[in-house]
Amino acid sequence: NAGGEFMQEEDIERLGRIAEQTWTRHFDDRLGLSHEELKRLEGVPAPALPVVEHLISDKPEHKVPWGDRKPPVAKDDPRNIWGFDMDAPQYSFDRGELHNLSIQRGTLTAEERFKINDHIVQTLIMLSTLPFPRALRDVPQLAATHHEKLDGTGYPRRLGGDQLSVPDRV
């Protein structure tokens, strides 16, 4: 998937069948990993070699939980005082091999797309803490609405055209 085409459901099913194939690994799969990756593997025992594994796999250690870093984007989150209305993915990152190879459209996973879209969330949170002079008091609002769409499918608040002022729409 180079990003310009769509992965059909049949292709994803075929990928799943390919992933079920096994191979015998004769080397330590922790060699050459970054400190961050090794930290995620703490508590996961290394199997005795050689070991039979699936050709492509989504392992529990591929899923990186949010912990206390989940941004307050859910509409019902009590920390959400900005009116965000976004669906955060279940995990902060999902580095599963099958998960990443099964992207139906484009090249970004839901987790990666959320990280990109989170820039406006962080921008609004930061800008709302700054003491803007009266003439610039709308800067946080204007910055936060540049990804909204008139049909209400934009982010970070899913505002529709009737909720957006003319400056918000520009």
Predicted regions and their residues:
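Metal-dependent catalytic cores of enzymes that make or break cyclic nucleotides
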Residues: 1-170
